[in-house]
Amino acid sequence: MAKRRKTSREKKEDTNWQERVIQIRRVSKVVKGGKKLSFRAIVVVGNETGQVGVGVGKAGDVIGAVRKGVADGKKQLIEVPLTKSNSITHITNGVSGGAKVVVRPAAPGTGVIAGGAVRTVLELAGVKNILAKQLGSNNPLNNARAAINALETLRTFSEVAEERGVSVEHLYT
């Protein structure tokens, strides 16, 4: 069986991804002989140019769990439309479980004002100026997924103009 070699282009695509571990938790499964321990890792993967994903991995060791989390995160990537000032186009909110996240665009120079898992998701998405607030649950996985949900609902100016049947220039006049 012949092995397929990675081309230089595929290697370049792999090198610009960044990953950050949000949480590592030791979990247990009760089996006949007692408790079987394993690790769960929540990982955010992004390239800081508008692509980001959240993954969860479970394995018997921490490194294996993180590796699986990165692979899962790359499977669940979303595209984030960024403005010229590296912010988002409009206010939006996202929900996942009991967690609700509200994100608002901010002026250049504001920075990322957000906490916990939401901050990590926004930074790896490439957003530089944004305000975000977590409401409800403080569960890191649900907050990260709520942030992804909020970023998924973003629309660009051209998409809104196309929906309304007008040109982008006439959108706000």
Curated annotation (Swiss-Prot):
Span of domain S5 DRBM: 17-80
NCBIfam families tied to this protein: rpsE_bact
Record's comment describing the protein's domains: The N-terminal domain interacts with the head of the 30S subunit; the C-terminal domain interacts with the body and contacts protein S4. The interaction surface between S4 and S5 is involved in control of translational fidelity.
Protein family per UniProt: Belongs to the universal ribosomal protein uS5 family.
GO cellular component, one term: small ribosomal subunit
InterPro entries, per database record: Ribosomal_Su5_D2-typ_SF (IPR020568), Ribosomal_uS5 (IPR000851), Ribosomal_uS5_bac-type (IPR005712), Ribosomal_uS5_C (IPR005324), Ribosomal_uS5_N (IPR013810), Ribosomal_uS5_N_CS (IPR018192), Ribsml_uS5_D2-typ_fold_subgr (IPR014721)
Function description: With S4 and S12 plays an important role in translational accuracy.
Domain of life: Bacteria
Quaternary state and interactors: Part of the 30S ribosomal subunit. Contacts proteins S4 and S8.
Keywords: Ribonucleoprotein, Ribosomal protein, RNA-binding, rRNA-binding
Signal peptide segment: none
GO biological process terms held by the UniProt record: translation
PROSITE patterns: RIBOSOMAL_S5 (PS00585), S5_DSRBD (PS50881)
UniProt protein name: Small ribosomal subunit protein uS5
MF-aspect GO terms: rRNA binding; structural constituent of ribosome
SUPFAM superfamilies linked: dsRNA-binding domain-like, Ribosomal protein S5 domain 2-like
